[in-house]
Amino acid sequence: MSEVKGLLVMDVDSTLVQEEVIDLLGEEAGVGREVAEITERAMRGELDFRQALNERVATLKGLPDSIFEKVYARIHFNKGAKELVDELHSRGFKVGLVSGGFHETVDRLAKEAGIDYVKANHLEVIDGFLTGKVYGEIVTKDVKVAKLKDWAAENGLKLSQTIAMGDGANDLPMIKTAGIGIAFCAKPIVRVQAPYQITEPDLYKVIEILDEVGK
């Protein structure tokens, strides 16, 4: 097996993809505005992420699980997403996703883009309907850091050989932990503290930063 040279771990909503998937689910449930407002406050760091997630998921109670198919059709990769993954793979990197979103959509995105690792939340479904609850470990800012460290260790990498990228307050600890931390079209709280920034929605810009740093 060839040696792994590095690892990129990134957020999904408003980073890998253009949309916030939970906001799309909220729209389908008829509570789009309320859900989007909570999302915005959580991403700015004004709300505890766990609390914000539970509040938003509760509004989805009673939706049929067929909703994921409908919502998936409305999701768009950000420019350069697949090209970035392909280029990193050609350089011997692994790529992982850590998302406060849901496996029901994130797993499909990962498969479509050829991504190696995924950690996301699970929505509880009983008899084909959402219960308004999540189950299992909730992907918080601390879990994002833990997965960055776990996947690095699994591949015999030092943290200096890792890249982390995201847009929201819950991505900041991960961004600060990685060798290269990137704010992607991020909220002000993230832009101010991240070592590197991408200000236009083009994920391939990661390669420019990587080359500039000379890793």
Swiss-Prot record:
The keyword S-adenosyl-L-methionine does not apply. Keywords: Amino-acid biosynthesis, Hydrolase, Magnesium, Metal-binding, Serine biosynthesis. One of its GO terms (cellular component) is cytoplasm. GO terms for molecular function: L-phosphoserine phosphatase activity; magnesium ion binding. SUPFAM superfamilies: HAD-like. Pathway: Amino-acid biosynthesis; L-serine biosynthesis; L-serine from 3-phospho-D-glycerate: step 3/3. It comes from the Bacteria. Belongs to the HAD-like hydrolase superfamily. SerB family. This is Phosphoserine phosphatase. It comes from Streptococcus thermophilus (strain ATCC BAA-250 / LMG 18311). The gene is serB.
